[in-house]
């Protein structure tokens, strides 16, 4: 297993290629959701200094993913980007084939993988170049079906060092899927640790780039 409870990945955050703050992915522990053991993973991103005055970002996303198959059991979001605010809490009941929010239930026939549970899942499997992987997710608005593909390798320079990385890109029907808030591209180190060295996340008003600076 390339990660474990207590793993902290800290990043320098760039917004539209300008350094603006920091972000962290942290595996906080194992908890039970609907009677299932799940890794609780927290993602936080926040701006600092002048960037925080011009366009403050204070985002927190928590997921609870299955400890064996790494699909999502629960997802919460607290998004604060400038004047844009959004919160959601989705619980997946796979025995009843529904995803529940505070206001509605949506029928599902898949094991959901949001951006972050998908990303941890990718760390646990061998990834072959040009192989297409298909996933589905629901984050409170609509069901999204998406594909991922390793398109090659790139050398990435980060504050932690230089890494040879596999590049994982989303697409749909041959087109780039990197157009909706929450879509991401990932550069995973081509070694046993499979570290997410670089993450690019599409946000409402631009693109946030995360570059790995510390692992603990």
Q: What is the role of each PLM region?
A:
Residues 1-92, 127-216:
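Acidic, serine/threonine-rich low-complexity disordered tracts
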Residues 81-125:
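Hydrophobic, well-structured mid-protein blocks that either form specific transmembrane helices
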């Amino acid at each position: 297993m390339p990660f474990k409870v207590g793993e902290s990945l800290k990043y320098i955050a760039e917004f539209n290629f300008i350094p603006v703050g920091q972000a962290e992915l942290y595996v906080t522990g194992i908890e039970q959701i609907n009677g299932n053991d799940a890794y609780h993973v927290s993602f936080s991103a926040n701006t600092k200094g002048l960037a925080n005055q011009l366009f403050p970002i204070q985002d927190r996303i928590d997921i609870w993913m299955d400890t064996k198959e790494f699909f999502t059991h629960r997802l919460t979001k607290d998004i604060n980007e400038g004047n844009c605010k959004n919160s959601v809490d989705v619980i997946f009941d796979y025995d009843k084939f529904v995803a529940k929010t505070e206001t509605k239930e949506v029928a599902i026939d898949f094991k959901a993988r949001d951006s972050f549970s998908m990303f941890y899942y990718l760390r646990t499997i061998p990834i072959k170049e040009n192989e297409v992987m298909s996933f589905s997710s629901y984050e409170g608005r609509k069901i999204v079906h998406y594909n991922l593909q390793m398109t090659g390798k790139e050398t990435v320079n980060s504050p932690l060092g230089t890494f040879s990385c596999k590049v994982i890109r989303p697409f749909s029907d041959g087109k780039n899927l990197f157009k909706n808030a929450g879509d991401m591209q990932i550069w995973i180190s081509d070694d046993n640790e499979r570290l997410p060295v670089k993450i690019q996340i599409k946000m409402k008003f631009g693109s946030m780039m995360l570059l790995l600076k510390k692992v603990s």
